[in-house]
């Protein structure tokens, strides 16, 4: 759902919820938790990214 990749003092949080990286409540909570914890892990910056093609289609809205 969320890959955490450390690049020295930069933490990359890569969305990994194919096919469109829709933001579910669980993913939003995980993003929030990861950003809040980043300084404790030595990160001086956080970059939120996704795989090639599509960053995110937005919120995961039930039909």
Predicted regions and their residues:
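Conserved CoA-thioester-binding segment of acyl-CoA-metabolizing enzymes
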Residues: 1-51
């Amino acid at each position: 759902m969320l890959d955490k990749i450390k690049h020295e003092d930069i933490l990359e949080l890569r969305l990994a919820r194919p096919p469109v990286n829709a933001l579910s409540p669980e993913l939003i909570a995980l993003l929030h938790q990861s950003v809040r914890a980043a300084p404790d892990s030595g990160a001086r910056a956080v970059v939120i990214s996704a795989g090639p093609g599509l960053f995110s289609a937005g919120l995961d809205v039930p039909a």
